[in-house]
A protein has these predicted regions:
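Bacterial Sec-dependent N-terminal signal peptides
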Residues: 1-25
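Residues within well-ordered alpha-helical secondary structure of globular protein domains
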Residues: 13, 48, 71-74, 108, ...
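Extreme N-terminal tail/first-helix region
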Residues: 23-33
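Short, contiguous alpha-helical
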Residues: 32-36, 40-43, 51-91, 130-173
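Well-ordered alpha-helical scaffold segments within catalytic/enzyme domains
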Residues: 41, 45-46, 80, 112-117
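Short, solvent-exposed, charged loop/turn and helix-capping segments
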Residues: 49-52, 92-93, 118-120
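Acidic/histidine-rich alpha-helical segments that form the ligand environment
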Residues: 97-130, 136-148
């Protein structure tokens, strides 16, 4: 009986120790929540925008509707590659900005961003990286990723409204 008690105690300690190491940092959970929010809104808006409007641009030299969606998707890959120290060609798909391509790229890029970020530990978040000629902690750079996504969500809302498309979540209110 005494041996069973010891085995149970050691097992319990190992279980709780393992669980505490496996817990996701609060910052990562909050980041993933923001990614889900922006993904949901951008995907709804991209779905609501008619295919014919994907080539619309508010002016010469400004990204079209479809190009904004593809840019947001590619930026997810690019900014994550900066964190990981990998190379990514930022302009590999921007010429293909039709609705089907844009939706597919966004879906995949958001899933990739979430899967990668979900693995980050507190130690990873504290690492220093260099991007855009500046030094960032990974945590701070993840804030930059979210800010960038929100920037293009706002841009996409403006584009939609300029084309007579009401964001689906606004239409429901």
């Amino acid at each position: 009986m005494h041996i069973l008690k010891k085995i149970f105690s050691v097992g319990a300690v190992l279980l709780f120790t393992t669980m505490s190491f496996a817990e996701q940092p609060v910052f990562v959970k909050e980041f993933l929540g923001q990614v889900d929010f922006v993904k949901g809104r951008l995907m709804q808006l991209a779905e609501a925008m008619p295919e014919d409007n994907y080539s619309w641009t508010p002016g010469e030299g400004v990204r079209s509707v479809g190009e904004v969606y593809v840019h947001a998707a590619e930026a997810n890959y690019y900014m994550l590659s900066l964190i990981k120290g990998e190379k990514f060609d930022m302009n590999s798909a921007e010429s293909k900005s039709d609705k089907k391509t844009a939706l597919s790229l966004m879906e995949k890029s958001f899933d990739n961003l979430k899967e990668s970020a979900a693995q980050f530990t507190d130690e990873d978040l504290d690492k220093e990286i260099e991007a855009f000629g500046m030094k960032f902690s990974v945590r701070n750079f993840m804030v930059t990723i979210i800010a960038h996504l929100h920037e293009h969500l706002g841009q996409s809302i403006a584009y939609a409204r300029m084309n007579g498309v009401t964001p689906p979540w606004s239409a429901q209110e």
